[in-house]
């Protein structure tokens, strides 16, 4: 009888450890959801910015202010896109060069010269 109780104790301890691991995973999932909600709030702000110019169409002064804000936001987005495109372009070039170099030498000569 003592052996059975001795076997039960380590099993209970193991179960406790596994429960702790599961709890940690749940916390990580919650953090990811909070991060996503922040991104959603950012996108909602950008949609609000688009609404403001239409509501301020009656006054000409506010129209110019909103148009400059929209222009700056567009510039920021374009800069980000250019950066990603540069990296993508480099990756494409490297993959194309590896394909060309692995091919017949006639292709390598025509492209290099």
Swiss-Prot record:
Q: Where is the composition biased (Basic residues)?
A: 20-41, 75-92
Region named Disordered: 1-94
State where composition is biased (Basic and acidic residues). Answer: 1-19
Compositional bias of type Low complexity: which residue ranges? Answer: 52-66
Protein name per UniProt:
Putative uncharacterized protein encoded by LINC00467 homolog
Which organism encodes this protein?
Answer: Macaca fascicularis
Source taxonomy lineage? Answer: Eukaryota, Metazoa, Chordata, Craniata, Vertebrata
């Amino acid at each position: 009888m003592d052996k059975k109780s001795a076997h039960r104790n380590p099993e209970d301890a193991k179960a406790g450890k596994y429960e702790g691991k599961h709890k940690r995973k749940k916390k990580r999932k919650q953090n990811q959801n909070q991060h996503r909600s922040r991104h959603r709030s950012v996108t909602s702000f950008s949609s609000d910015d688009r609404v403001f110019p239409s509501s301020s169409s009656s006054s000409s002064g506010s129209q110019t202010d909103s148009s400059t804000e929209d222009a700056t936001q567009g510039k920021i987005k374009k800069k980000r896109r250019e950066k990603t495109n540069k990296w993508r372009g480099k990756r494409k070039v490297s993959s194309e060069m590896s394909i060309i170099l692995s091919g017949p030498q006639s292709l390598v000569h025509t492209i290099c010269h």
